[in-house]
């Protein structure tokens, strides 16, 4: 292609334009107005022609007079032809706008099911958010990104996949976070560390819905979030991303009266620098630096974060590679715990009975987090490879005193989560794929919130597991998957908890573009150190319960995935899933009158069933793109004699998105998410926090306008454009309308 | 978008009719050691508590002042009560609550107002209390 372009250029080079000859020039752009380089423009049936430069311009001179058909062509675009008549000495201009062809899109490859496979072959519901989706929406943290995924609802900082989590006051997570396949829940509260991501170097975020314990063990009770980071490119890449914005002052005078900050715009900003390159023929990697500053939309909700991440890949020999991902995050932030009532929701409330003079609904901390994820992969043969990986997650968290100075670490938390795993992938025959492995992990945490026992300041919870998975393509249309995992957790020196988690999946390709699947799986979650041992009177009266039992789930799902293409006009991808999950022994915080405090207890027997459908539409070669995701939940608490709605779950959840390409390199987009008001919330919280029982539906509209030219992208975003005031979890007002401008410079 | 535009979401509740309890407490006799006087507040309860436990269980039925000054001869307090939707509110048990220890439930009554307080919207009720740490009140349910 390059050679032919060069040949055409050489042929077209004039020695001198003769007066009786004509000249033709013009520009070639795509339908969105972006200049196209390297497009061949030829006069059909002659040797006259040229290729466009970086600005999309072409020039063909010394053309004999006559009538010609001019053809512009490039890979990925529909060739365009125009007829032109050139008179002697004429200098004509002829511009082209090429329409992209619908090239068969590369298969979306996902890895959440423990091995890379095309999305169409994954026999369970799964949603994918790409880096482009994250960047287009100006997102910097995982929780913000998850808000745009169908079937996922954030309850404060807890992830609900199809209603799995509810709200348990930030302790424990029923959703497992994996970074490049390694579990990464925090060592202090077993929570999802939302800011612990190199956001500009992620390739995609995969959300696997439904029990995933057969694949990943405890924590994957309600689903799995897999964040896949990028590899380094062949050519060096540098990106600078600057983003700034502000929260709009709240419109209610009564709220402003209680906090001066609410009368002013509250700024926030982020600066990201990334650089990726090959360092030698065997080594390459990237570095990612982030600075984030957010003054917060609530009093005492400021945060500052500095983060550095790097990923190196070294190929010591053919068929072998070593990958090391490591990151350091320093964070200083106020955690706004609960408001001071609906008359004063911008200030933290207080519970005077706790007795502490600084016992307000906010907790100021400074933390340092370090992660190290090394992995070695070796492929001794064409059909077999193994991966040995390790992980280390260190957290040092110190509370701040009234002057903002960090208190000693002994007053805070020091936590370690570490472990390793071996996984073997073997494809003994076409259509058969076996995965086996073993893992060992441990958490060791010393915290002022966890009283020491027998002189051992560190609370620990080691675990070991073995797992296996067999995939078999029974025929060209039927694919069967079976998996089994055995986990053993040591919760005390003399007590182990063991669990066997099977799963089975069937996939049937009814016809090209239509697959049906059925899935069954067991899930479990061992309560974390925080839930079992937390003792606190400073912020909330809460006492330990070391005897908590694991939560368990049994999940079923049937679903279909379809794809339809109508040439250039339309491309449509859709899913439909019906799911049913029974939960037992869900851990919930309850006020224990005899203990005069809250305590995590095994309480709830629950059933969550429902349906979920998604529809992705791409019209006119990408001129218009839309997404719709709807989830209907029937979530019931079966603990009592009569079924009750399960608390903190919305019955209806709707996510929609629309993106439209405009002339002049502009793209306009909107995202709307709607969640119905929870039918029931936990009233225990409202004993102490005023108006904690107040909820409204969630109705949030985000708007974005992007202007992209060459390597520069400018995005203007309006989040919560309708300035709708709502809560995602009790007693915490979500951000009001805020504006954001993002500049992205890609070299 | 139409759905989202229906209303503006959460808003402050409409203004409520208020009532005010204002008062002064005089301290007689010596003050105990500072470790034994962690905090003092005026509280007005809609019920008669039998124990500390009940204070926590019925926390939302208690109106309370800010923390009072310690080691003074006297101090003033003020409690504003929201009487939205009610013609009158009755506080059966009120007085100065004394936090005597480090634990969250180390509270006891120091001095109790000798009659129920019945407040109507717009009403301002001044009261005077005399406290003596050598002779504190006790919970009605206590021996």
What are these regions (language model features)?
Chain A
Residues 186-188, 201-203, 214-226, 231-308, ...:
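Outer-membrane beta-barrel translocator/receptor signature
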Residues 182-209:
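Short acidic/polar hinge/loop motifs at secondary-structure boundaries
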Residues 332, 339-346, 444-446, 490, ...:
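Surface-exposed extracellular loop regions of Gram-negative outer-membrane beta-barrel proteins
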Residues 380-401, 509, 517, 549-603, ...:
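Membrane-embedded beta-barrel scaffold of Gram-negative outer-membrane proteins
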Residues 29-34, 39-44, 73-77, 87, ...:
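Short, acidic, small-residue-rich periplasmic hinge/interaction motif at the N-terminus
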Residues 126, 143-186:
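Extracytoplasmic beta-strand/coil segments of soluble accessory domains associated
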Residues 475-480, 573-582, 601-683, 742-744:
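Gram-negative outer-membrane beta-barrel transporters
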Residues 294-309, 313-315, 319-379, 384, ...:
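Flexible loop and strand-edge segments within Gram-negative outer membrane beta-barrel domains
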């Amino acid at each position: 292609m390059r050679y032919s372009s060069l040949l055409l250029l050489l042929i077209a080079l004039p020695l001198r334009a003769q007066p009786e000859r004509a000249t033709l020039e013009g520009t070639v752009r795509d339908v969105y107005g972006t200049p196209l380089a390297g497009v061949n423009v030829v006069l059909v049936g002659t040797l006259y022609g040229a290729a466009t430069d970086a600005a999309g311009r072409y020039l063909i001179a010394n053309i004999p007079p006559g009538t010609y058909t001019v053809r512009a062509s490039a890979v990925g675009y529909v060739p365009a032809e125009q007829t032109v008549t050139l008179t002697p000495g004429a200098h004509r201009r002829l511009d082209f706008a090429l329409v992209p062809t619908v090239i068969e899109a590369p298969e979306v490859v996902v890895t959440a099911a423990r091995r890379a496979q095309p999305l169409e072959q994954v026999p369970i519901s799964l949603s994918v958010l790409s880096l482009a989706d994250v960047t287009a929406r100006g997102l910097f943290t995982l929780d913000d990104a998850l808000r745009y995924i169908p079937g996922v609802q954030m309850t404060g900082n807890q992830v609900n996949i199809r209603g799995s989590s509810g709200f348990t006051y930030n302790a424990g997570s029923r959703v497992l976070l994996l970074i490049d396949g390694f579990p990464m829940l925090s060592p202090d509260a077993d929570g999802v560390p939302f800011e612990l991501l190199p956001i500009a170097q992620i390739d995609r975020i995969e959300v696997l819905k439904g029990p995933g314990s057969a694949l990943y063990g405890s924590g994957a009770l309600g689903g799995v979030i897999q964040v896949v980071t990028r590899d380094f490119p062949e050519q060096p890449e540098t990106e600078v991303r600057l983003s700034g914005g502000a929260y709009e002052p709240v419109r209610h005078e009564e709220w402003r009266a209680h906090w001066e900050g609410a009368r002013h715009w509250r700024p926030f900003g982020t600066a990201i620098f990334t650089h990726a390159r090959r360092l030698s023929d065997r080594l390459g990697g990237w570095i990612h630096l982030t600075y984030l500053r957010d003054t917060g939309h609530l009093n005492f909700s400021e945060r500052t974060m500095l983060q550095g991440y790097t990923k190196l890949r070294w190929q010591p020999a053919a068929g072998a590679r070593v990958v090391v991902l490591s990151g350091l995050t320093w964070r200083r932030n106020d955690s706004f715990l609960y408001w001071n009532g609906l008359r004063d929701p911008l200030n933290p409330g207080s519970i005077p009975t706790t007795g502490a003079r600084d016992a307000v609904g906010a907790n100021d901390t400074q933390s340092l987090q370090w992660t190290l994820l090394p992995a070695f992969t070796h492929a001794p043969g064409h059909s077999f490879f193994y991966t040995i990986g390790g992980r280390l997650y260190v957290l040092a968290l110190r509370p701040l005193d009234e002057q903002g100075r960090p208190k000693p670490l002994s007053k805070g938390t020091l936590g370690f989560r570490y472990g390793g795993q071996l996984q073997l992938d073997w494809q003994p025959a076409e259509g058969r794929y076996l995965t086996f492995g073993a893992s060992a992990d441990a958490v060791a945490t010393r915290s002022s919130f966890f009283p020491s026992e027998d002189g051992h300041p560190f609370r620990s919870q080691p675990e070991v597991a073995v797992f296996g998975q067999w995939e078999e393509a029974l025929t060209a249309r039927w694919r069967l998957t079976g998996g089994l995992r055995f986990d053993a957790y040591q919760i005390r020196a003399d007590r182990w908890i063991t669990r066997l988690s099977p799963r089975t999946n069937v996939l049937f390709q009814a016809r090209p573009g239509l697959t049906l699947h059925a899935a069954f799986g067991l899930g479990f979650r061992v309560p974390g150190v925080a839930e079992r041992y937390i003792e606190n009177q400073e912020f909330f009266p809460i006492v330990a319960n070391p005897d908590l039992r694991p939560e368990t789930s049994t999940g079923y799902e049937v679903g279909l995935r379809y794809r339809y293409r109508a040439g250039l006009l339309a491309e449509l991808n859709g899913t439909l899933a019906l799911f049913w999950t029974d939960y037992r022994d869900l851990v919930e915080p309850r006020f224990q009158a005899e203990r005069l405090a809250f305590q995590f207890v095994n309480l709830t027997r629950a059933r969550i069933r429902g349906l979920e459908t998604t529809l992705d539409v791409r019209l006119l070669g990408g001129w218009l793109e839309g997404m719709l995701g709807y989830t209907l939940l029937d979530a019931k608490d079966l603990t009592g004699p009569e079924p009750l709605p399960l608390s903190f779950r919305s019955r209806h959840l709707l996510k929609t998105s629309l993106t439209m390409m405009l002339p002049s390199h502009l793209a306009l987009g909107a995202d709307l998410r709607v969640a119905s008001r929870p039918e029931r919330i936990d009233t225990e919280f409202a004993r102490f926090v005023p108006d904690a029982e107040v909820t409204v539906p969630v109705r949030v509209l985000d708007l974005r306008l992007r202007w992209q030219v060459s390597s520069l992208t400018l995005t203007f975003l309006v989040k919560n454009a309708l300035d709708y005031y709502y809560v995602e979890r009790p007693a915490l007002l979500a951000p009001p309308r805020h504006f954001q401008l993002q500049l992205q410079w890609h070299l | 978008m139409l759905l989202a535009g229906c209303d503006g979401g959460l808003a402050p509740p409409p203004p409520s009719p208020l009532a005010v309890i204002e008062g002064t407490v005089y301290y007689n006799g010596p003050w105990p050691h500072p470790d034994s006087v962690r905090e003092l507040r005026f509280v007005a309860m809609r019920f008669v508590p039998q124990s500390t436990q009940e204070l926590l269980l019925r926390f939302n039925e208690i109106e309370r002042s800010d923390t009072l000054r310690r080691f003074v001869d006297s101090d003033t307090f003020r409690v504003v009560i929201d009487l939205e939707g009610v013609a009158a509110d009755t506080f059966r048990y009120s007085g100065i609550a004394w936090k005597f220890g480090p634990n969250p439930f180390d509270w006891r009554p120091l001095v109790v107002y000798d009659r129920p307080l019945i407040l109507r919207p717009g009403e301002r009720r001044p009261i005077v209390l005399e406290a003596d740490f050598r002779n504190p009140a006790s919970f009605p349910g206590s021996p």
